[in-house]
Amino acid sequence: MNKILETLLEEKKIKLKGSLYHLTQINFSYNSNHIEGSRLTEEQTQYIYETNSFIGDKEKVISIDDINETINHFKCFDYILENIYILDENLIKTLHKILKNNTSDSQQEWFKVGDYKLKANFIGNSKTISPSNVSKEMKKLLDEYNSKAKITFDDIVDFYYRFEAIHPFQDGNGRVGRLIMFKECLRNDVVPFIIDEEHKLFYYRGLKNYKEDKAYLIETCLSAQDKYIKLLNDLEIFK
């Protein structure tokens, strides 16, 4: 077990405030949901995490889904820490099920919580893999990825891009994919990273232009990794 995973699991167990686990939970949930349009602030996310309650802003309406998906993301993060084994469809679908539990999406008959999409969808103006082909394409992606003798940082980012291109779920693909990247970094002894507000536009551009220039998305993720390394150093994780 690598030092980062060991630290996260230990701090989770003892519920240590101000720790790597504590800060990662808040930072990861806030940023990953914010990218997808959540209106919660980082301070509100922290308050929800620390108190399991919510204080709203009179000037801004907050969706119940934003609150539930924030809480669900905390649970998703715990799930990946407790399931650092080879990546498979069951784990990916379970992350989606946890993330979308008790949301308005989960009340829709056509929205498959914890299963692949039934309706075609787009990323921007680009059509994704059709629902009838998702299962086949996901199996192919996982088989190719898991067959690698050694999985590198670049392999993890490449998997994420291909996962996003398939867009297997009706919604929640970005958050599930970023959770997968964090998990796979831990599993393969790579320092993980969180895509935050500072990196968001570069991240979008990297995804859009990945086929022509893989380096842009990889460099963006490496920059995000540098921020997590700084946090590790500030907390003296490797001392």
State what each model feature region is.
Residues M1-D171, R175-K239:
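FIC/Doc superfamily catalytic core
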